[in-house]
């Protein structure tokens, strides 16, 4: 594969370290920047990743995919990390439109009974063309505001998933084009909307502390209500506004959003064809309760309609390391309960932390594996 590197650090020499899918170093190249841009060629193998370093400077480690055209190395002043953005050769990234949806029935617990959603359409969008639908449970952080404009005030210091960049590249090379709906989940109801309806004692001890606020003053988890909002309000609204293919949708999420995508997808297999589940908070549930929950999903009974599962897990940082220990058995358990291993793609990166920088490259990598003919 060939891609361009833009060096925004104003450093003439950098080492580019290439890792195998298992994390072993397979190449180490010294790059010399006579100007800020150079072209690099690598032998692409599925799951390879790279990072750049010189002395005390070391960037994040990012997994590569054939969709990547340009990587930009920069220093992020907000989180004080050396980060890597990716760009397209054409400066066109589509458009985001914001809608506010009301639902008195399912969003009864919210003071205003409303949710903001952000709908991204590609740069070549046409009302005459039919599109597949992707729903993301972390809507406030999935699009890069420098490319699609300001659409939310709830930004994260780690930036965005840059989904607009990935899907633009994906749509160029695939028959099926996507539009993307992001659901804003950055307010006080994030945990209660994205976490299964359970008792506080069903969670592991650390999670009980984290989720205690969800149960104050008679409150509870609202995942079932939130799921019904998607099915009964969001989906009909999107179908009325956009020309969608009459096919199943894709759901995407990380952390609590990863847990939501996992359970929403497996509880609604008749609606969902693909699940992207990153750094999932499924590990916050006690093992016995989790096993009981998996059994209720009736995986064996629904073998013919099981969604494709794309599971990512990092291993760096306090939170990500804890989730990694809990999620270590997720794939083996799914297989034990009858999940077709050919429908599960799994990537573990020990150097990846619990943030958008990690998830944007995991998403880019996984979506490059999609086969339109499946």
Question: PLM ranges: what are they?
Answer:
Residues 3-23:
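Structural motif
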Residues 5-9, 42-44, 110:
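Non-cytosolic beta-sheet module surface loops
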Residues 22-38:
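Short, acidic Ser/Thr/Gly-rich low-complexity loop/linker segments typical of extracellular
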Residues 28-29, 60-62, 105-107:
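Beta-strand-rich interaction surfaces with strong enrichment in secreted/lumenal proteins
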Residues 35-50, 62-67:
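Short Pro-Gly-centered beta-turn/loop motif in secreted/extracellular proteins
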Residues 46-55, 73:
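Short, aromatic- and glycine-rich surface loops/edge beta-strands on solvent-exposed regions
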Residues 50, 86-374:
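Non-catalytic cap/lid and distal C-terminal segments of serine-dependent acyl enzymes
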Residues 60-90:
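Extracellular beta-sheet/turn segments enriched in Thr/Pro/Gly and aliphatic residues
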């Amino acid at each position: 594969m060939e891609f361009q590197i833009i060096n925004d650090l104003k450093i003439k020499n950098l080492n580019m370290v290439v890792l195998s899918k298992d994390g072993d170093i397979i190449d180490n190249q010294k790059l010399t920047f006579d100007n800020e841009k150079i072209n690099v060629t690598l032998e692409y193998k599925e799951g390879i990743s790279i990072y750049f370093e010189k002395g005390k400077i070391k960037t994040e480690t990012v997994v590569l995919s054939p969709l990547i055209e340009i990587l930009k190395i920069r220093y992020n002043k907000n989180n004080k990390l050396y980060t890597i953005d990716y760009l397209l050769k054409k400066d066109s990234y589509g458009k985001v439109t914001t809608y506010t949806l009301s639902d008195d029935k399912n969003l009864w617990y919210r003071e205003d009974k409303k949710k903001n959603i952000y709908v991204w359409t590609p740069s070549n969008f046409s009302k005459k063309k039919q599109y597949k639908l992707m729903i993301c449970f972390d809507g406030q952080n999935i699009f890069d505001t420098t490319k699609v404009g300001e659409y939310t005030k709830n930004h994260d210091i780690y930036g965005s998933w840059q989904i607009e960049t990935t899907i633009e590249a994906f749509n160029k090379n695939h028959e099926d084009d996507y539009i993307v709906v992001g659901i804003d989940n950055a307010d006080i109801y994030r945990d209660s909307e994205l976490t299964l309806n359970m008792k506080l004692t069903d969670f592991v001890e650390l999670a009980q502390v984290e989720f205690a606020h969800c149960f104050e003053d008679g409150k509870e988890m609202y995942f079932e209500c939130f799921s019904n909002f998607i099915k009964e309000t969001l989906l009909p609204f999107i179908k009325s506004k956009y020309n969608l293919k009459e096919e199943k949708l894709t759901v995407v999420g990380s952390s609590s959003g990863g847990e939501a995508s996992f359970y929403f997808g497996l509880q609604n297999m008749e609606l969902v064809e693909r699940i992207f589940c990153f750094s999932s908070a499924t590990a916050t549930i006690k093992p016995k309760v989790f096993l009981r929950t998996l059994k209720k999903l009736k995986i064996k009974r629904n073998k013919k309609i099981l969604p494709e599962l794309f599971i990512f897990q990092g291993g760096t940082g306090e939170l990500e390391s804890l989730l990694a220990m809990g999620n270590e058995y997720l794939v083996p358990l799914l297989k034990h309960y009858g999940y077709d291993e050919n429908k599960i793609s799994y990537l573990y990166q020990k150097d990846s932390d619990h943030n958008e920088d990690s998830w944007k490259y995991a998403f880019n990598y996984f979506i490059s594996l999609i086969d339109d003919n499946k």
